[in-house]
Amino acid sequence: MAIDKEKIKQAVRLFLEGIGEDPDREGLKETPERVARMWEEFERMRNFDMKLFEEFGGYNEMVLVKDIKFYSLCEHHLLPFFGKVHIAYIPDKKISGLSKLVRTVRAFALRPQVQERLTEEIADFLEKELEPKGVGVVIEAEHLCMSMRGVMSPGHLTVTSALRGVFLKDIKTREEFLKLVKGV
């Protein structure tokens, strides 16, 4: 997907005018350009090489990366939601560098999104790329569309999960994953 900086700048300027602001005042005159550059930066961060390793000593237990901090934008209100992602997988023939799990989260989070789909997209992508015995993804997030508008009740977490393979089919694997996520 290509970013159209000019359209973004025009849209931000129109938005500012639409809410009664003067887009030419000192604090706002560079805002359209800043927002366009931000989306260009997001687009660059979404592209990465999912380097996989097939020689890893036959490790066949759970690999878990906890507390991956993320932020995204609610596609309904364009307000942030943010929190932590926990990803686990059980290798079959391939493993990933741990940083690639963080990059996977970032790649799917840096666009207008809903948490439920974000959870599914991360799990589906890792299942496709790693071909593991199973994948588990849990996301805990606070949504500013609930905290600063509507019900205006900050501090609540929404928790979503996506389970694939043995994480879905084997209750013991699922329980181990959820206990490790909770830190028990």
Curated annotation (Swiss-Prot):
Tell me where on the tree of life, at the top rank, the source sits: Bacteria
Q: In which pathway does it act?
A: Cofactor biosynthesis; 7,8-dihydroneopterin triphosphate biosynthesis; 7,8-dihydroneopterin triphosphate from GTP: step 1/1
Q: Which GO terms describe its molecular function?
A: GTP binding; GTP cyclohydrolase I activity; zinc ion binding
Sorted keywords for this record are: GTP-binding, Hydrolase, Metal-binding, Nucleotide-binding, One-carbon metabolism, Zinc
Question: Single Gene Ontology BP term?
Answer: tetrahydrofolate biosynthetic process
Q: Which residues form the signal peptide?
A: none
Sorted alphabetically, which Gene3D superfamilies does this protein's record hold?
1.10.286.10, 3.30.1130.10
GO CC, any one term: cytoplasm
For this protein, the record's InterPro entries field holds: GTP-CH-I_C/QueF, GTP-CH-I_N, GTP_CycHdrlase_I, GTP_CycHdrlase_I_CS, GTP_CycHdrlase_I_dom
Q: Which residues form a coiled coil?
A: none
Asked whether the keyword Zinc is assigned, the reply is yes
Catalysis performed (reactions): GTP + H2O = 7,8-dihydroneopterin 3'-triphosphate + formate + H(+)
Q: Where does Zn(2+) bind?
A: C74, H77, C145
Pfam families, per database record: GTP_cyclohydroI
Q: Family, per the entry?
A: Belongs to the GTP cyclohydrolase I family.
Query: What is said about its interaction partners and assembly?
Result: Toroid-shaped homodecamer, composed of two pentamers of five dimers.
Protein's UniProt name: GTP cyclohydrolase 1
Q: Which organism is it from?
A: Aquifex aeolicus (strain VF5)
